[in-house]
């Protein structure tokens, strides 16, 4: 082979090898692109809302004859569908309640800028829980806190923080309100915010941070709502609202709301005589509320809401150990499921109860005359048997020497069941504690447990003598 032939042969072999290497690199590139765009793709309906993807870095070391290729690609997790909550899981079986959260707002107010509040409550989105309260437009160590015992002023706003975070100066003011309710439908928050003159108030419906609808007072006598969470099932949220006398017959309606828009209004029906400040919970496929009768009964009204056909039924908790304050001594109190018991019915306090088969779990003040102490227990047959009084699993939440206040329920969806939780408002200041001029609160929160538990007392704990006047 002459020199020219050798050169041509070597050149041909080199060109062939180079071509093979080039084709291999193209194959590697095609494989990488295919993995990125096809291996991890997810099909989802076009009309479903999706959550932002979280990036994950995957490294692949591919060794070939000629090159070592270190390829880094960024992969998107398949989009997580955001769906309406349907609350179809069963209720958790519990033995009692365990401590969950306490915000210590009053104690912290002795040395920090903490809002003056009342009417607190708790509600959760699918990921975490939040505490709400109606602020008085002032911090505690501020002369504007004088005379904040009054319920309805134009300065009151709905405050919202992550559960356990006191209402500090950086707290978000969600809306203007002296009465409110909030709930999350699985996609966004709904806030119902009532404000204005007593004789012509307005309820604003704020969904996903935007005002969507409103309704004016229909009886011109302090339009008001739950002061605890509303409930949304398959995109329809229900809220109970009352307008009218606090000590005689009033006009109660249930509003059905979809993404902030009122789609239906149903009047109260059934045997309940007076309904205010309902504590509501999902009872699939409907919503159940236990409320306050401020006119005739110290037994609590029950309102059952059918989300599908907008029908309403009402009655009273059957337990003869009644839940309102003031009330008769347990030896003399009564309830027969259908009607108010006409026992110290005038006045009352927001509270809660929930059914557990034929039984009922409930919370109430320990004192039968004042908002002092707090206890929970289960009444066997208390949901279905008239005047049932067999009490078990009693727990003291706040001892009888300390003040309590409003209380209410909220629900938390777990992997296999829906847990019931409650909060207790711990009121401090006026009227009882006249050394100071303000009225405010902290909260303590418990949740249902299937485990064992101990004993204790969880009062507000602030020394009034150390507090700003």
UniProtKB/Swiss-Prot annotation:
What processing steps or modifications follow its translation? Answer: N-glycosylated.
Q: Which InterPro entries match?
A: Glyco_hydro_34, Sialidase_Influenza_A/B, Sialidase_sf
UniProt-annotated glycosylation sites, renumbered to this chain: 61, 70, 86, 146, 200, 234, 402
Q: Please give, as recorded in its UniProt entry, the membrane topology of this protein.
A: Single-pass type II membrane protein
State its cofactor: Ca(2+)
Which GO CC annotations does the UniProt entry carry? host cell plasma membrane; membrane; virion membrane
What are the protein's UniProt keywords?
A: Calcium, Disulfide bond, Glycoprotein, Glycosidase, Host cell membrane, Host membrane, Hydrolase, Membrane, Metal-binding, Signal-anchor, Transmembrane, Transmembrane helix, Virion
The record's region (Head of neuraminidase) falls at: 91-469
Virion surface topological segments: 31-469
Q: Where does substrate bind?
A: 118, 152, 276-277, 292, 371
Q: Where is this region: Involved in apical transport and lipid raft association?
A: 11-33
GO biological process terms held by the UniProt record: carbohydrate metabolic process; viral budding from plasma membrane
Where is the stretch described as Hypervariable stalk region? 36-88
Q: How is its activity regulated?
A: Inhibited by the neuraminidase inhibitors zanamivir (Relenza) and oseltamivir (Tamiflu). These drugs interfere with the release of progeny virus from infected cells and are effective against all influenza strains. Resistance to neuraminidase inhibitors is quite rare.
Active-site positions on this chain: 151, 406
Q: Which HAMAP family match?
A: INFV_NRAM
**Note from the entry:** The influenza A genome consist of 8 RNA segments. Genetic variation of hemagglutinin and/or neuraminidase genes results in the emergence of new influenza strains. The mechanism of variation can be the result of point mutations or the result of genetic reassortment between segments of two different strains.
Q: Domain comment text?
A: Intact N-terminus is essential for virion morphogenesis. Possesses two apical sorting signals, one in the ectodomain, which is likely to be a glycan, and the other in the transmembrane domain. The transmembrane domain also plays a role in lipid raft association.
- What is the stated purpose of this protein? Catalyzes the removal of terminal sialic acid residues from viral and cellular glycoconjugates. Cleaves off the terminal sialic acids on the glycosylated HA during virus budding to facilitate virus release. Additionally helps virus spread through the circulation by further removing sialic acids from the cell surface. These cleavages prevent self-aggregation and ensure the efficient spread of the progeny virus from cell to cell. Otherwise, infection would be limited to one round of replication.
Kindly state the subunit structure of this protein: Homotetramer.
The protein's name is Neuraminidase
Q: From what organism does this protein derive?
A: Influenza A virus (strain A/Memphis/18/1978 H3N2)
């Amino acid at each position: 082979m002459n020199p020219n032939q050798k050169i041509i042969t070597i050149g041909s072999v080199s060109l062939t090898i180079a071509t093979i290497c080039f084709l291999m690199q193209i194959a590697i590139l095609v494989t990488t692109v295919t993995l990125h765009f096809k291996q991890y793709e997810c099909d989802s309906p076009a009309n479903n809302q999706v959550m932002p993807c979280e990036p994950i870095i995957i490294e692949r070391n591919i060794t070939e004859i000629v090159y070592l290729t270190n390829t880094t690609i960024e992969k998107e997790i398949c989009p997580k569908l955001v769906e309406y909550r349907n609350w179809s899981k069963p209720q958790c079986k519990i033995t009692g309640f365990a401590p969950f959260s306490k915000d210590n707002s009053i104690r912290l107010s002795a040395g920090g800028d903490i809002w003056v509040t009342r009417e607190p409550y708790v509600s959760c989105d699918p990921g975490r829980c939040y505490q709400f309260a109606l602020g008085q437009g002032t911090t505690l160590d501020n002369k504007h806190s004088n005379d904040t015992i009054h319920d309805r002023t134009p300065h009151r706003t709905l405050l919202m923080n992550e559960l356990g975070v006191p209402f500090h100066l950086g707290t978000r003011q969600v809306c203007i309100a002296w009465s409110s309710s909030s709930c999350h439908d699985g996609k966004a928050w709904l806030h119902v915010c009532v404000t204005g003159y007593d004789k012509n108030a307005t309820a604003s419906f704020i969904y996903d941070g935007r005002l969507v609808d409103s309704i004016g007072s229909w009886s011109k006598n302090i339009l008001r709502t739950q002061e605890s969470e509303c409930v949304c099932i398959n995109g329809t949220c229900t809220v109970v609202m009352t307008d009218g006398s606090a000590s005689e017959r009033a006009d109660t309606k249930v509003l059905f709301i979809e993404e902030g828009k009122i789609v239906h209004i149903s009047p109260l029906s059934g045997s309940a005589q007076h309904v205010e400040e309902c504590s509501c919970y999902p009872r699939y496929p409907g919503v159940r509320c236990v409320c306050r009768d401020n006119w005739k009964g110290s037994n609590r009204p029950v309102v059952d809401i059918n989300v599908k056909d907008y029908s309403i039924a009402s009655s009273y908790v059957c337990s003869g150990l009644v839940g309102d304050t003031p009330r008769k001594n347990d030896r003399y109190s009564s309830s027969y499921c259908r009607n108010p018991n006409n026992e110290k019915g005038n006045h009352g306090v927001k509270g809660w109860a929930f059914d557990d088969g034929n039984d009922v779990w409930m919370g109430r003040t320990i004192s039968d005359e004042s908002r002092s102490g707090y206890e929970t227990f289960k009444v066997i047959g208390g949901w279905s048997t008239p005047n049932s009084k067999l009490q078990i699993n009693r727990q003291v939440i706040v001892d009888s020497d300390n003040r309590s206040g409003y209380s209410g329920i909220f629900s938390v969806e777990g992997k296999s069941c829906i847990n019931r939780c409650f909060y207790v408002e711990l009121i401090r200041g006026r009227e009882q504690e006249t050394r100071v001029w303000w009225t405010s609160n902290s909260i303590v929160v418990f949740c249902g447990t299937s485990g064992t538990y101990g004993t204790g007392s969880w009062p507000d704990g602030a020394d009034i003598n150390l507090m700003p006047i």
